[in-house]
Each structure stands twice: as C-alpha cells, then as structure tokens.
Amino acid sequence: MSLSLNDIKFPSSWDLSPNDLSYIDDIYQEGLDLGVWRKDNQRDKLANENVVSLSKYFWPKVEYKKLIMGGELMLWFFTFDDAIDAGLYSDEKTAEIVKRMDRVFMDGTLPENPTGPEKVALSLRTKCKIMCGEQRKGTFNRFITSCIQWVDSIVPFNKVIANGDSPDLELYGFLRKVNIGAYPCVTLTEVMLESTLEQYIWFDPRWIKMNENIAIVVTLVNDLVSYEKEVRDKMGILNPLFFLQTKLNIELSESYKKLVDMIHHWISEYNELEERFLQLFTTDEEKKQIQFMLDHLHYLISGSRLWSMQTPRYISNTSPFIEMRKNCASLSITSFVSNCAESQRDLKKRKRV
C-alpha cells in the first residue's frame, strides 16, 4: 500500500529550508563531555546526528548560539525519554528519575551522581537563565515550567495503556499534546527572541489555544511517520494510525484519511486563531517579534514532517509512505543504525520463521 505524506496540506508560507549552520559535531562533543555519549562509539555518533538534526528544521533562521540551544533541547528530549520508554526501570525507580530531573530545572542544581541527561538539562537551563537575565524572569520560568510538565507527562502517558487497550482518541490527544514536547520548543523560542513584548501576551487564551493546536498536529504527524517503527516495537497500541484500524475495523488507508482530516481541521482552526491574535499588535516592532514566534509554530509542523521523511529513526523500505521508502533507498548501505537495515533484518527473520 502506498500513502503519501504530501496529502498533509498547510500554507506554503510555512515551508522552510533547514538551517545550514554547522553545529551537530559541537553538540556531539558536548554530549561526550557531559556523559550522554560514549567515546569512539559510532552508533552514538550517528544517533546524535539523527536526533540533534531536528533542531535545524525547528529553528531554520536563528544564529549559531541559539541553534546550539535547540540542539541541546533535542539531545535532552531523546536521551531522557528513550531511557524511560525502554522500560528498563521499575515504577519506583522511574518516579525517582522524574523527581531528580524536576529538581534540576526547579533549583538549578545537580543531584548526587548526576546522569548525562541531567547534566544536559542543567547546561541548557543555565544558558536560558543567562539569556533571559533579570528583565525576563517570566520567560525563564515559562521555559523551565514547560520542561517540568513534559518530564511529568512521560509516565502518565505510558500508563494510559495499563489495561491493555488503546485509549480513546480524545484522551490520547489531551495527554499527548503535552508529552510530544512542543511546549518546551515554543518557550525556548521565546527565550531566543529576547523580546520586549509585554508578558501578558503569552497568557492570552488565543495564544495558548494556538500552541495546543500546533502540538496536536505535531503529535499526529509524528504518529504517522513512526507508525511502522511502533508497530514493529509492539507499541502500536499507542499509535492512532494503528489503533483506529482495530477500534473502527477499518483499513490502513481509511485510518490515514481520518487522521489527515483531523490535521487539516486543527490547522484550519489554528489559522483562524492566528488571524484574530495578530489583531492585538499595532506597531511594526511588535508585529516583527510576534512573527518570529508564529514562524516557529509553523516550523514545528513543516519541519517535523520534512525531518521525519529523511531521518533513519523512522524511514524504512517497507514503510506505507512513499516518501519514506524513497529516502530509505537513497541512504548509504553503511548506515547500520538506519531503520532500513533494521527492517531488512526483520524481514529475513520472518522469512526464516
């Protein structure tokens, strides 16, 4: 079956070209220094490139030091979340890990025997605090609060399938819009903006609702591109492209159409909210600053789709999506961590069985 991610439509003004600044090796070195990655480990180096590359799609026009901050956020997201999602820890140990990370953001200190992700979190927190200074404590607090909320969302989201059944789509979306990690990206962008805008703007219900809509769309895009990986990892129960098929007894193509229609609904509602929100601003400087934030919301969607089409984390020669199969075929055969190689090995195993 051939589906196309290009069925997802959004305004052409949301299109982007990835940031061309060189920064990935610098984040890798930082990951080595902070104990996230292992020295002389090719798998770690490739993993770093795969996950950190996302920031050049989310922040395609920022300067180097800000792109580094975006790269650190991606490094922290993936290394902290993947360890918990792997199911390596008991509930008690997981609760302790979450509490430790919360304290890093709240207090700006490291616990005893800090982990690599905890050190990355403190490094990013410190940079944000310096950039915000004394004049923008509200911005800084919004950033660290959004990070804590994301950390606290991981366990509840994973527990939503405790009864062995997929959640209702509405409940799934409500939990996932925090768990997807869009809010820390937005608040980090506010830190980068070095804004002179009044703080009350970020509490406007239209702005908050716009953020929620974007988070839901990013969630659904991520669910589409990760479909095959999650089914292969026995986690399809938490992927709506999969669980809508089983709940509604429909084919993959029909499930995909339903999700694309949902994406278009949320984008349409977002556009209407954005138009109303922009009416609040009258001066050219205000409009320029708020456009920087709006562009980032747009890039979270367009960048997520564009990155997902080419990252070895998701592409596969057996993907239901044309673009992901095509890009898998163009990968070097030596990229042994790619999903292409993984899916080929899986196919061979199934054939032997």
UniProtKB/Swiss-Prot annotation:
Pfam family, one: Terpene_syn_C_2
GO biological process, one term: terpene biosynthetic process
Motif (DDxx(x)D/E motif): 81-86
Keywords carried by this UniProt record: Lyase, Metal-binding
Motif NDxxSxxxD/E motif in this chain: 222-230
InterPro entries: Isoprenoid_synthase_dom_sf, Terpene_cyclase-like_2
EC number: 4.2.3.160
MF GO annotations: metal ion binding; terpene synthase activity
Reaction it catalyzes: (2E,6E)-farnesyl diphosphate = (2S,3R,6S,9S)-(-)-protoillud-7-ene + diphosphate
Function summary: Terpene synthase that converts its substrate farnesyl diphosphate (FPP) into the sesquiterpene protoillud-7-ene.
Note on domains (UniProt): Contains several highly conserved motifs that are important for catalytic activity including the aspartate-rich 'DDxx(x)D/E' motif and the 'NDxxSxxxD/E' motif, both of which are involved in complexing metal ions to coordinate the binding of the isoprenyl diphosphate substrate in the active site.
Annotated family: Belongs to the terpene synthase family.
Protein name listed in UniProt: Terpene synthase 1
